[in-house]
Amino acid sequence: YAKAARKVVNDGHDTIKLDPFLEMIPYHTTYIDGRISKKGENQGYDIVSAVRESVGDDIDILIDAHGNFDLPTSVRLSNRLYEDSNIGWFEEPLPPESFQALENFRNQTFSPVCVGERLFTRWDFQHVLENNLADYIMPDVTWTGGISEMRKIANLAELYYIPISPHNAQGAGQILAGAHIGMHVPNFYKLEHCIAFITGYNEFLKEPINFV
């Protein structure tokens, strides 16, 4: 992880996102108990610490929890990672169904919070924004229904001075759609992509994307 992170930085990126809790892949008992073993937890801490040591203090490290954890586990993980490695956000700390649980998490964590890839309309995001449940939102241009709805979500977030970071899990077209939105809203933050998939992305395009 540390070596891969250094390569990302050397390629020109200023932010790295990862899920360090390998025990939860592929999703383990996510919707059953939401917990992680002490061994798996410590492995996650060690991975993020190694990445931080490798890339230094000027690179943002973002953590994606994939909604895998229950409330006390998410609070514990996010606070430890923020205190030890100064993470830039803890994303999807809980399954997305309960805004009340998200509020409880928000009140107990020190880390910045990012949510939104599994919220689908501006009305979903309105509740998050009105109740100060996140520092960043991550709408998905595919799952929100397209560029028009995502632009409306971005404009709504702008009223609350909340940055947006378009979620990307669908490939080259989604990256280009997210970039299109990012060029037209003032509260654009980062555009997600996976370095392992770049070759595959470019096979769908007439002109390759320069990701730096």
Q: Model segments located where?
A:
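Shared catalytic-loop signature of beta/alpha-barrel
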Residues: 79, 86, 95-212
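Metal-dependent enolase-superfamily TIM-barrel catalytic cores that perform enediolate-based chemistry
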Residues: 1-108
